[in-house]
Amino acid sequence: MTAILERRESESLWGRFCNWITSTENRLYIGWFGVLMIPTLLTATSVFIIAFIAAPPVDIDGIREPVSGSLLYGNNIISGAIIPTSAAIGLHFYPIWEAASVDEWLYNGGPYELIVLHFLLGVACYMGREWELSFRLGMRPWIAVAYSAPVAAATAVFLIYPIGQGSFSDGMPLGISGTFNFMIVFQAEHNILMHPFHMLGVAGVFGGSLFSAMHGSLVTSSLIRETTENESANEGYRLGQEEETYNIVAAHGYFGRLIFQYASFNNSRSLHFFLAAWPVVGIWFTALGISTMAFNLNGFNFNQSVVDSQGRVINTWADIINRANLGMEVMHERNAHNLPLDLAAIEAPSTNG
């Protein structure tokens, strides 16, 4: 016993710090990824709150027409947002010390870059921390794999898309109405609704919601009663109990008769893998779709694809969507372009003397 105490006392300060960082006995696990996650997420959160409340208007389009996004400059919770970094900055790394003054940094939307880059680093470290804690506890790594879907989606809209478009001003604003504006403009410029990867993402999100509701309702409906009629059924469960809390055979039989036999899982493990994999794979595809459309590999174009025997166009829903896209596009950055992009691309005729 004496030898053990002596060994503990002789342990270096660094060794004790390492043991504390990697200890699974802490109320909240820190881990080596947490050492980077905590300061980056605290920085992103702090700057977001301050900027959402008090940041001055930002010249997002680089045309000396600042756009207001903070509460103190006339917005509310719905309309407020962190305005993306100015198109005048493009993809340049724009920390505070690169600007001539803090006022210039704020005018050019410096807080957006600061928040986004710290946030992406923080959520990536959160994913690594999930893997690290799973490793320490001897668990399989699939929690971190599942979390990679929202990390990929955030990286796509905040980093990959601006890189593909050439400016952080094309990134998604950090606010409710700003998010909707980003979605509308994205549809106008890339026809995302006609992209198969977005369709897979919709199937993943809505399908995941459906399967989650089906699973939860089936389990809740087939609980093994351990309580009286006057008690909540939830009181019949104790954390860590060895007995099954619901009858999977009854749930399997019910669903097999409701749809057909092979629509129901008879293996709880494969069922829960399916519940996790379906939305994750769907969101992976959506993130991949955003990343490809960032470089203008856009959704399908079926405009004027149906004509009659005389060559006259018979409009389809694709043409209706195209007309909506044109309307949304001409309303976007309406003061930044003197001509629609289709006309601006045509060479002007040369004139002599």
From Swiss-Prot:
Name the catalysed reactions. 2 a plastoquinone + 4 hnu + 2 H2O = 2 a plastoquinol + O2
Q: Where is this site: Cleavage?
A: 344-345
Q: Residues that bind pheophytin a, according to the entry?
A: 126
- Record's keyword annotation contains Lipid biosynthesis: no
Which PROSITE patterns does the protein's record reference? REACTION_CENTER
What is the UniProt remark on how the cofactor binds and its stoichiometry?
The D1/D2 heterodimer binds P680, chlorophylls that are the primary electron donor of PSII, and subsequent electron acceptors. It shares a non-heme iron and each subunit binds pheophytin, quinone, additional chlorophylls, carotenoids and lipids. D1 provides most of the ligands for the Mn4-Ca-O5 cluster of the oxygen-evolving complex (OEC). There is also a Cl(-1) ion associated with D1 and D2, which is required for oxygen evolution. The PSII complex binds additional chlorophylls, carotenoids and specific lipids.
In-chain residues carrying the UniProt-annotated modification N-acetylthreonine: 2
Pfam families attached to this UniProt entry: Photo_RC
Q: What family is this protein classified in?
A: Belongs to the reaction center PufL/M/PsbA/D family.
Subunit structure as annotated in this protein's UniProt entry: PSII is composed of 1 copy each of membrane proteins PsbA, PsbB, PsbC, PsbD, PsbE, PsbF, PsbH, PsbI, PsbJ, PsbK, PsbL, PsbM, PsbT, PsbX, PsbY, PsbZ, Psb30/Ycf12, at least 3 peripheral proteins of the oxygen-evolving complex and a large number of cofactors. It forms dimeric complexes.
Task: Give the protein's recorded name.
Answer: Photosystem II protein D1
Q: What organism, scientifically named, is this protein from?
A: Gossypium barbadense (Sea Island cotton)
Q: What is the lineage of its organism?
A: Eukaryota, Viridiplantae, Streptophyta, Embryophyta, Tracheophyta
UniProt gene name: psbA
